[in-house]
A protein has these predicted regions:
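Helix-to-loop junction immediately C-terminal to a conserved catalytic motif
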Residues: 14
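Short coil-to-helix segment of the ABC ATPase nucleotide-binding domain corresponding to the Q-loop/switch region
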Residues: 51-58
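Conserved ABC ATPase signature
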Residues: 91-95, 99
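Hydrophobic anchor residue at the start of the ABC signature
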Residues: 105
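Conserved catalytic motifs of ABC-family nucleotide-binding domains
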Residues: 112
């Protein structure tokens, strides 16, 4: 639900915000600040408009220990993964909104993260482009072997992209429902199994609209 802290939770997972209590661990490592192992992709691509596609994709590597040869190899692979090879030397201002989001995705992938965090990055795109990117991101994650945590208000997107859906509600937010999404790939919106899970998830989402956090028990 809106305002329940989904994006705040994602920022904590990215090390951008510190939790008021507890800590976040990735394979035993505490996440306390941004790092190449966990990368966040935002709603807007936030590209450098004066740079080419390749330059934008490789900008994060310029602050690290990577050699020129390794940087070029990583950039080339990331651009290939998002299918932008023909536009590698184009200025990003010349690209469509969907292509710019692919550049932002490649910029995240070039770091070879273990965890990719997505904050509704496809919400402003047209339906066709959004559907294509949803499938591509899931496919790339499976091929490269990294995990994804993404925030969405789109139930179809949750079923198409996810292995588990977590519904939050209330303010401050609480996890009120969880649902495993055990479906084979590729997933199509018209598949009966996809539609069945979508219906279950929609029911949970509607129940969350009426969620009220239980009052703490008090002693007489």
């Amino acid at each position: 639900r809106s305002g329940c802290g989904k994006s705040t939770l994602l920022h904590i997972l990215a090390g951008i915000l510190k939790p008021t209590d507890g800590r976040v661990l990735l394979d035993g490592t505490a996440i306390e600040a941004p790092a190449p192992r966990w990368v966040m992709m935002f709603q807007a691509p936030h590209l450098f408009p004066w740079m080419t596609v390749s330059q934008n994709v490789g900008v994060g590597l310029s602050f690290g220990r990577w050699s020129k040869q390794e940087t070029e190899a990583r950039v080339t692979e990331a651009i290939k993964l998002v299918e932008l090879e023909p536009w590698a030397d184009n200025n990003v201002q010349d690209l469509s909104g969907g292509q710019q989001q692919r550049v932002a995705l490649a910029r995240s992938l070039v770091m070879e993260p273990e965890l990719l965090l997505l904050d509704e990055p496809f919400s402003a795109l047209d339906a066709f482009t959004r559907s294509s990117l949803q499938k591509d991101v899931r496919s790339i994650a499976k091929r490269k072997g990294f995990n994804i945590v993404f925030v969405t208000h789109d139930i179809d997107e949750a079923v198409i992209m996810g292995d588990r859906a977590v519904i939050m509600a209330g303010s401050p937010g609480n996890i009120v429902h969880e649902l495993d999404i055990d479906l084979p790939d590729p997933r199509e919106r018209t598949d009966a199994a996809v539609q069945a899970l979508r219906t279950r998830l929609m029911t949970m989402f509607q129940e969350a609209a009426n969620y009220k956090k239980p009052e703490s028990a008090t002693l007489a």
